[in-house]
Design a protein with these regions (language model features):
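AMP-forming adenylation/ATP pyrophosphatase catalytic core
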Residues: 142-334
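ATP-dependent adenylation/nucleotidyltransferase module used to activate substrates
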Residues: 1-185, 314-316, 320-329, 333-334
Length: 334
């Protein structure tokens, strides 16, 4: 380290998931006098809510970037493939480090860090996975993993004296006992469970996403948010509907639907679900959607039911015989 570097504050930018490991990695570096800040990313698949909580708990400044466009470009064809569901963990982490590296370079930080622990996760935190992420981020020489540093090759930051390697840690494996002990040392009493908050690891959401990707090349954010709510049914190659399961579903569907191009269907005079048809559809599909809407309502099974159809320039009522849930099940996206 030069004299000039020794006299200035070293600045590090950390990727923060909001979990305990992220918090500890920042505090370990802050103990050395490094000025630490965090960066977190938002898409329709995950939010920065936990990272904001961690920032409040530790006083570490947090920057949140929205990266949906870049993420979708990666998600359609991840170089390392998907995990158990639609989760492209390795390419996701590489993208996040690349975006963090660009932010680091633009805002004068000295290096990047994360709370990753060698061997903690079987797919994304093996030694080969960490190397893959570093290589494909474009910032391999700027990434420090403080919690497992002593089990990994020495980084340029350590060689240059920007951080003291002897004060970094040698954690590895799936045991959480060392982290819990370290949390007690730092006075951290509240932190989320290590389970992730990414929708792409959810089996049901992933199936609905795969169906959307197979039938709609646009992948607009609104359609991605809709995947979280209701029963999704594929009526035809270009037509799907979403049927509310609960009152909360119904409220979310009514909030998220686009009245300029989507159709919203509800039974009139009887309790029933909110149904939306993204992008509308041909006449026969609208009638089928209305019949399914009636089938999930409190309407009599054997008589016609009035269903109001609004949106996409329409505001009218049609009468249909209900298609009952056991008949509609064949349309479910599973």
């Amino acid at each position: 380290m030069s004299l000039e570097e020794a006299q200035r504050t070293i600045r590090a930018l950390g990727l923060c998931s909001g979990g305990l490991d992220s918090m500890l990695s920042a505090l370990v570096l802050r103990d050395q006098g490094v000025h630490v800040e965090w960066i977190n990313f938002e898409t329709p698949f995950f939010s920065a809510a936990k990272a904001r909580q961690a920032a409040r708990a530790t006083g570490v400044p947090l920057h949140v970037l929205e990266i949906t466009d870049d993420y979708l470009a990666m998600l359609t064809a991840p170089r390392a493939g998907y995990g158990k569901n639609m989760n492209p963990c390795m390419d996701c982490h590489a993208l996040m480090f690349r975006k963090a590296g660009e932010y680091m370079r633009a805002h004068g930080f000295d290096f990047l860090f994360s709370g990753e622990v060698l061997g903690q996760r079987p797919m994304s935190q093996t030694a080969s996975s960490l190397r893959y992420v570093a290589k494909h981020s474009g910032f391999a020489d700027a990434i420090l993993r403080p919690l497992s540093a002593l089990r990994l090759p020495e980084t340029p930051m350590e060689q240059q004296g920007l951080v003291d390697r002897t004060r970094l840690l040698d954690l590895s494996g799936r045991s959480r006992k060392p982290q819990i002990a370290l949390a007690a040392h730092y006075g951290i009493t509240e932190y989320p469970a290590p389970a992730g908050g990414c929708l792409l690891t959810d089996r049901g959401y992933s199936r609905r996403l795969k169906d959307l990707m197979d039938h709609d090349a646009a992948l607009l954010p609104g359609a991605l948010h809709l995947l979280q709510h209701g029963r999704h049914m594929r009526l035809g190659p270009a037509t799907k509907i979403i049927v509310g399961r609960t009152q909360q579903d119904n409220e979310q569907l009514a909030r998220l639907y686009d009245p300029q191009q989507d159709l919203l269907l509800k039974t009139t005079g009887r309790p029933g679900p909110t149904v939306i048809m993204p992008g509308g559809g041909p006449r026969e599909m609208v009638y089928l959607a209305a019949a399914i809407c009636a089938g999930y309502s409190k309407a009599p099974e054997t008589s016609t039911t009035a269903v109001q159809v609004t949106g996409a320039g329409r505001d009218d009522t049609i009468s249909v015989l209900p298609v009952l849930p056991n008949e509609a099940r064949r349309f479910l996206i599973t």
